[in-house]
């Protein structure tokens, strides 16, 4: 597939089971006020006006359902056994004579992410940063603890941030990070894509996140999302 220079492709890993949410279906397929989380996430990306193509990775037995839900809005691929493998599989569709300039990776569970946040990440990429993540300052005090629950220390909160998605990268950097990082450590040890970039020595730039880009993981998160959607 030939792609134009400067194109932005967004990958949405949505192959997880969402066991903590316990809604009886994979989390991405849960309907929030009549619309699935995956549909809301994809629409937010496209509504930003800065994303050209969306690739969604879903459980292998849900590909037909995903195509029916999303139609022409996204390419559908089967995901893997964990998040890192799923993104890796989605990256394979980017092979061709011309790769996109930038790749975003966005959690389907962050279904209410404002389009303006997506645009902010891409703007930073176009400004010359090779890896960009949206973040929010922490309001809670954080404790480091050992396996026995003993507090080891209290990190300085002023220097800590909660990371959101979409996370954006130059395509070459993300591909190199996955190729090398996945060989060095088990996939389960990487909780986000920026961690892979950090692992190979890449620099990651932060931009302002948005409270609406919270991850719907628990029943409490779901209640909050429902309240927001219903106004």
From Swiss-Prot:
One of its GO terms (cellular component) is plasma membrane. Keywords: Isoprene biosynthesis, Nucleotidyltransferase, Transferase. GO terms for molecular function: 2-C-methyl-D-erythritol 4-phosphate cytidylyltransferase activity; CTP binding; magnesium ion binding; manganese ion binding; zinc ion binding. Pfam families: IspD. One of its GO terms (biological process) is isopentenyl diphosphate biosynthetic process, methylerythritol 4-phosphate pathway involved in terpenoid biosynthetic process. The record marks 157, 215 as: Positions MEP for the nucleophilic attack. The record marks 20, 27 as: Transition state stabilizer. Its EC number is 2.7.7.60. It is an enzyme of class 2 (transferase). It comes from the Bacteria. SUPFAM superfamilies: Nucleotide-diphospho-sugar transferases. PANTHER family: 2-C-METHYL-D-ERYTHRITOL 4-PHOSPHATE CYTIDYLYLTRANSFERASE, CHLOROPLASTIC. Belongs to the IspD/TarI cytidylyltransferase family. IspD subfamily. Was identified as a high-confidence drug target. Catalyzes the formation of 4-diphosphocytidyl-2-C-methyl-D-erythritol from CTP and 2-C-methyl-D-erythritol 4-phosphate (MEP). This is 2-C-methyl-D-erythritol 4-phosphate cytidylyltransferase. The lineage of its organism: Bacteria, Bacillati, Actinomycetota, Actinomycetes, Mycobacteriales.
